[in-house]
Regions:
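Alpha/beta-hydrolase-fold serine-hydrolase catalytic core, especially in secreted/extracellular enzymes
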Residues: 130-193
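Acidic beta-to-alpha connecting loop that harbors the catalytic carboxylate
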Residues: 24-25, 111-114, 149-150
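Short beta-strand/loop motif that positions the catalytic acidic residue
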Residues: 106-110
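Active-site-adjacent alpha-helix of alpha/beta-hydrolase-fold enzymes
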Residues: 111-142
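Phosphate/oxyanion-binding active-site loops and adjacent basic polyanion-contact surfaces
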Residues: 33-41, 66, 116-121
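Primarily recognizes the serine-hydrolase "nucleophile elbow" in alpha/beta-hydrolase
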Residues: 57-101
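Active-site machinery of serine-nucleophile hydrolases
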Residues: 1-50
């Protein structure tokens, strides 16, 4: 956990804003899947708004490798907190994507990143997002990038996610939401509780 965390601190350089690389409080394969993480992110966002003047409608989520696993989990659960999200080299597991209706979402994976069948699973999830958007043209904004001849490390091609995400501003009151609960139960989503 510490090795990847130290790497992530300097991996991306956004053109504007504050870049934060949080460390999970425990060392476990499912470090980002557990319920206390949601509260940690909520409090981190609130502190950044109050202490650093961060615009709450311009908060973005991204993660690489195990952090990408976390994006797969956190983005659908906390879609109401972010303006956009980008997942890099993570495994989706069995997560549902329906809650991403109002959260622009990017998928990045190397075509040769076959550990745990990660490459095929990311491609499948990209097609699932295509299908969701086909049935809901005003939602499910997304891009899927399965990079040929790249493995788990994508030579920073995935950094293209930053300017893409920065184009989006969160709408805290969208006309339509989809809220499906999974492993971690939440007591509210957007304005519904």
């Amino acid at each position: 956990n510490d090795g990847q965390w130290n790497n992530q601190k300097h991996l991306y350089k956004p053109a504007e804003g504050i870049y934060v690389a949080p460390r999970a409080p425990w060392n476990a394969w499912n470090m980002w899947f557990q319920e206390p993480i949601d509260k940690m992110f909520e409090e981190l966002i609130q502190m950044m708004i109050v202490c650093k003047g961060v615009n709450p409608n311009k908060v973005y989520l991204m993660g690489y490798s195990a952090g990408g696993d976390g994006v797969w989990r956190l983005a659908p659960r906390m879609a109401d907190h972010f303006a956009a999200a980008s997942m890099m080299a993570g495994h989706p597991g069995d997560v549902g994507l329906q809650n991403l209706r109002n959260l622009p979402f990017m998928i990045w994976c190397g075509a040769e990143d076959a550990a745990y069948n990660r490459n095929d699973e990311c491609a499948k999830r990209g097609k699932e997002m295509d299908s969701l958007q086909l049935n809901c043209p005003d939602g499910y904004i997304h891009q899927t990038h399965i990079l040929p001849q790249k493995g788990h490390w994508m030579d920073r091609e995935d950094a293209a996610a930053l300017p893409w995400m920065e184009k989006f501003v969160r709408n805290p009151y969208p006309d339509t939401i989809i809220w499906r609960q999974e492993d971690v139960l939440r007591d509210c989503f957007y304005w519904i509780s």
